[in-house]
Amino acid sequence: MNKKLLNPLEDPPTASSSEDVDEEISSGEDEKEHISNSSSSEEENELKDLSTQTLNSPSTEAPTLDSGSETNSDSDKPIVLTSQKKKEGTDSSGTKRASEGTSSKDIKRAKKVSGDDDNKKFQSLWTKEDEISLLQGMIDFKAETGTSAHDDMNGFFDIAKRYISFDVSKIQFGDKIRGLKKKYFGVRKKKGLDLDHDKKCLGLAKSIWGLDGKEVVVLGGDSETSNWFEKSFLVRVVARLGVDECIVKWKWSKVSKETKKRIEEKMKMVEAKELELLSQKIDVLKEVASVIAETI
């Protein structure tokens, strides 16, 4: 087949396609530029609007600042509240301690008051007649048995409790005896006794414990001190033989009053002879001293 030859003059090459492409490219670029320009202008307008809104609305920032200040103040408030809580805690602890101290004081006062009430109740049980009966009973018990009530408290209690107006115990009995001795001898040294009852009890107490609170022996109703035996050489001599002094004194309290009286008279005779011998010794000493003086 024969190919048809193209005439360059009649059919020139179509260059419109490249031009069209160029035009399309340029038109596309123009559109892009237009779009970009329009978008940039829109962005600028939006920024302007935002800036104008921001500039025209200072009140919107003020609340923000105020809210910030409120936030700061709120942040400070917990510190204040914490300190207040600490103070309240301190106050509460102090109040608690004060209440504990007050409660302990109240307990001590209550105990003291209850103790005083018990003492008053104990004292109110003993009447004046009971005190006189107790003291007189100690004197009579010593006269009848030759034994002190302190040495035989059980025997004395069995006898004397019948003369007390209430059901007394042995502990109350002993406490009352010690209390009467302390009362009358202590008061007598500090101040005088005005009541007739106290004066009578003091007289009985002297018969029991002596002028200075020393125990005495009652013989036939007449009181005489037993200190002469305890202070004499007899106790020491007997104790040297191997007997305890307390046993010697206790055994001596069991001796009958007639025997005690007889031994006491002999003791007085011995003491008189001792004084006579002492005077004789003094005479001999003077004579020896004079002889030595003349010799020198």
Curated annotation (Swiss-Prot):
Keywords, alphabetical: Transcription, Transcription regulation
Signal peptide: none
Start-end of Acidic residues biased regions: 19-28
Native organism: Arabidopsis thaliana (Mouse-ear cress)
This protein's record includes keyword Nucleus: no
Chain intervals with Polar residues compositional bias: 52-72
Positions of the UniProt region annotated as Disordered: 1-119
Protein name per the record: Probable transcription factor At1g44810
GO biological process: positive regulation of DNA-templated transcription; regulation of DNA-templated transcription; response to cadmium ion
Highest taxon in the source lineage: Eukaryota
Lineage: Eukaryota, Viridiplantae, Streptophyta, Embryophyta, Tracheophyta
Entry keyword Metal-binding: no
GO molecular function, one term: transcription cis-regulatory region binding
Family the entry assigns: Belongs to the GeBP family.
Biased composition range(s): Basic and acidic residues: 97-119
